[in-house]
């Protein structure tokens, strides 16, 4: 089953940049906007840089992985020593963020700047040890204008987001269809749209 990729950029306390993709990434809620990514330990039994950096600095960026960026995503997945810059290794250009310190990936069409909320640790049964599930609140969103439709919606077919499957397999979005659930419950429809303003209006205004 395809899963969105958490291409997470962070910076450590010494100012060294880090970039890594995670197969377990998802939005948790849209109001407030919260996302999560899950990370096993590395092959040495250590917590990964992305987790440690997010916890120590309180910040991370999600960069949308796309079909055009697939090779760079794969290169940035390699397990490397602490302090190695995956941006440079993958030949990527860095963009400054607006509110936080971690850099963004130039060429990625959408970025979420996130502030760290908390980590939930689960015991792991594999050789990779425990699993860290990191939660963050989205404080800024960047969307490339070239990836918007005339109506101001994200053109997913143009972006071609990359998704992780099983084994060594990936896929990308090249087809979509639209369905609206029956009924006229405005609060439910607003929730499905992911529209905070419409949801608040449908439930009695600002909260």
Label each PLM-derived region with a short phrase.
Residues 1-207:
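Basic, polyanion-binding surface patches
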């Amino acid at each position: 089953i395809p899963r969105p990729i958490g291409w997470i950029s962070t910076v450590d306390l010494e100012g060294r940049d880090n970039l890594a993709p995670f197969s377990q990434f998802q939005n948790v809620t849209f109001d407030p906007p919260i996302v999560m990514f899950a990370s096993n330990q590395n092959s040495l039994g250590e917590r990964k840089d992305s987790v440690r950096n997010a916890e120590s600095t309180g910040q991370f960026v999600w960069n949308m992985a796309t079909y055009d960026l697939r090779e760079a995503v794969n290169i940035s997945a390699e397990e490397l020593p602490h302090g190695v810059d995956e941006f440079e290794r993958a030949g990527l250009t860095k963009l400054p963020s607006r509110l936080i310190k971690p850099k963004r990936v130039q060429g990625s069409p959408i970025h979420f700047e996130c502030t760290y909320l908390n980590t939930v640790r689960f015991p792991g049964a594999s050789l990779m040890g425990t699993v860290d599930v990191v939660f963050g609140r989205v404080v800024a969103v960047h969307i490339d204008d070239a990836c918007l439709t005339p109506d101001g919606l994200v053109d997913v077919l143009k972006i071609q987001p990359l998704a992780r499957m099983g084994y060594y397999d990936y896929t990308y979005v090249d087809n979509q269809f639209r369905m609206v659930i029956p009924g006229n419950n405005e609060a439910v429809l607003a929730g499905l749209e992911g529209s905070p303003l419409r949801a608040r209006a449908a439930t009695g205004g600002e909260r």
